[in-house]
Amino acid sequence: MSQQLWMERQKAFTGPPQLTETTTTANSRKTMARRSRTKTKLFFLLISLIAFLAFVPVFAPLPSFSSHYSLSHRHQHRKVVTSTVAVKPGSFEIDDDKFWKDGEHFRIIGGDLHYFRVLPQYWEDRLLRAKALGLNTIQTYVPWNLHEPQPGKLVFEGIADLVSFLKLCHKLDMLVMLRPGPYICGEWDFGGFPAWLLAIEPPLKLRSSDSAYLRLVDNWWGILLPKVTQFLYNNGGPIIMVQIENEFGSYGDDKAYLHHLVELARGHLGDEIILYTTDGGDREILEKGTIRGDAVFSTVDFTTGSNPWPIFKLQKEFNAPGKSPPLCSEFYTGWLTHWGEKNAKTDADFTASALEQILSRNGSAVLYMVHGGTNFGFYNGANTGVDESDYKPDITSYDYDAPISESGDVENAKFNALRRVIGLHTAASLPSVPSNNGKMGYGPIQLQKTAFLFDLLDNINPADVVESENPLSMESVGQMFGFLLYISEYTPKDDKSVLLIPEVHDRAQVFTLCHSKENSRRPTHVGSIDRLSSKTLGLPNAKCASNISLFVLVENQGRVNYGSYIFDKKGILSSVFLDGRILHGWKMIPIPFHNLNEVPKINAIIQVALSRSITVSTQTGLKDKSGNVSEVPAFFTGHFFIENADQIQDTFISFSGWGKGIAVVNDFNIGRYWPSFGPQCNLYVPSPILRHGENVLVILELDYPSPELVIHSVDHPDFTCGSSKSK
């Protein structure tokens, strides 16, 4: 207790002093002094308030997600439960800490299923399986980079046909929670941002109220949101909620940014749709990631197996009174897997028990994922550890150990366990479970080397070659995915040289070529430098009479999609040093592989490789001097036949025994393989990619092919390859 407080309490017990002339005069002086001090305090308080308002943003009130209906309407809800009052259909609202659909109490039992990870021909199949699990809602991201891969180049067809996906959800009576970003995370390249944002100068401040960034977001949402307005529930469609950003509290603290997104969404979607945020169930994260009150509905996610109810109690603090139905908007059924790790698995009964904790007390949950699908093309994301160099790219499969497997299988323990729990909390009987789709192994496929990558450089359009004094990033030369070849020259010396590339994203294969030597048509592999390991490489003494050409082939293995290092440019991002001196004079040659959503679908470089299947293989040696298949990036092609149309079924291509590369089946990029690192051995090939008769497989092997030059088409997945073997 302070001395001042102790003295004040003592005075209270001694009673008032006797009033004399002296004490009266003294009291008068004290009164005047108090008035003077009061005026001084008010002056400084006013100055402090002005300073506070000058530096702290004051936002205009945001519209409530429930402001369109009145208290009398809320009372109607309670009556409708007993079917005494009819309510206009097409309303999805929150009141009394519950969801209300057309006036009826409603519980969300949903699941994430991303249309861009499943071929359109299989959308209905996967949705019906989700429905058989007992789900009533589908949640999906919308990746900006899929729909606008180049500035102003819009793609809303094929696997990017969001409108058709929404129509199908509506047809199957599945509600939708839409997550349009602009940032989505989702183990998707760059968190869904288009890579061309990285080429803008000065650099954008992503996920912020930076005006340059917001102008681009305004433009993108100005294209996207009008397309989905007709599908809002209040307009007769399936969309019941639209998410603002994604787990923003784990990244930043910029309320002006969140307010801008809310106002932008309201401007396009109107005041009736519920806007929501998703953040981890932590007070500090929620403070930064959402907006208190009823402008948005704050939802939470948390580790599966955590006690959900203290987190739901915390959730209520960030929502307006009566506006916080408990909802875990990402209930994790499994987890992601990086290259070099064991395949992530979670126990079926443990997962089902965790879901039971939520549903048993009338909570809602969205399974992340109900069906993972596949990172086709070059769209896999990546994570970092303690720093930017601790780089971990995701595998091609996004199976996620979800109840519906990558290939759609449902005959598994997790599907059954979750369905049993959901069935206990669903009034209507669940739909019957479809059987697994058929799988077919088409056997061994003999490959032949058709062309070395370097042999095809003459087919690159000269206008696409960029020259610069110093290396440029992939984004700066317009190569957003795949590979970029850097070429320079240096003067040889008598002993070895040391090459240093301080910053390369993500993996560089180094080759040299002495033009004065006989049979020097093709560069020789020297070694590799990557983001994780040593940045130096010894270059052998070539004893070359001319300058030596240095070739550095850089692979973009997937941009970081989460955390502080999402501004993840690719290519050589620093000077290149040779024996301590900067190497100048560079050519950069894009290697034009198509990504998932590119038009036209025919890949020019693949067609060139196929056309040279005879001439190149006969004119050039396939092996080095020691008789081994040379470690130079090369194209291999193979053919397999499907005799009858009814034999066209899903298959898996096994790359066991091969090194690292990409695979294309019938001009469709099925993704990356890396069995030498693991754990994924086989790539999934959905049946719609295949055709009756001849099917063509083309692979670019970067490291070393199997000596037999054989791969196998099998009827099952396999995640037991590499040093991190797992069943």
What are the roles of these predicted feature ranges?
Residues 114-133, 151-170, 494-503, 529-535, ...:
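Aromatic- and glycine-enriched glycan-recognition loops and surfaces
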Residues 6, 12, 41-48, 214-228, ...:
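Carbohydrate-binding surfaces of carbohydrate-active enzymes
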Residues 236-323:
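Gly/Pro-rich turn-and-neighbor structural signature
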Residues 82, 87-121, 128-132, 158-165, ...:
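Extended substrate-binding grooves/exosites of carbohydrate-active enzymes
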Residues 122-191, 195, 262-272, 387:
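Aromatic-lined substrate-binding rim segments of carbohydrate-active enzymes
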